[in-house]
């Protein structure tokens, strides 16, 4: 279910302030955040935002195609190692 248009997109206040400050200075710096629920807006294009995935911060470079998505979509939280075979597993060979 999508968010109501009258409410507007959710962006964490601290993240928005950091981006506006960097845009005013004209600098591009990695911004560290834990806010995975924040929506990507056009102000963020060209910045690199390090999004926390529960263990570490994953750097995400924001492009124009990402606008409207959430930051958490680009920082996976689970590592899939495949279906690992054990050494003595004879049943899987049948």
UniProtKB/Swiss-Prot annotation:
One GO-annotated biological process of the protein: ribosomal small subunit assembly
Top-level taxon: Eukaryota
GO molecular function terms attached to this record: rRNA binding; structural constituent of ribosome
A Pfam family it matches: Ribosomal_S19
Subcellular location: Plastid, Chloroplast
Gene Ontology cellular-component terms listed: chloroplast; mitochondrial small ribosomal subunit
Record's keyword annotation contains Plastid: yes
InterPro entries assigned to the protein according to its UniProt record, in alphabetical order: Ribosomal_uS19, Ribosomal_uS19_bac-type, Ribosomal_uS19_CS, Ribosomal_uS19_SF
Keywords, in A-Z order: Chloroplast, Plastid, Ribonucleoprotein, Ribosomal protein, RNA-binding, rRNA-binding
Protein family membership: Belongs to the universal ribosomal protein uS19 family.
Reported function: Protein S19 forms a complex with S13 that binds strongly to the 16S ribosomal RNA.
Identification of the protein by name: Small ribosomal subunit protein uS19c
Upper classification of the organism: Eukaryota, Viridiplantae, Chlorophyta, core chlorophytes, Chlorophyceae
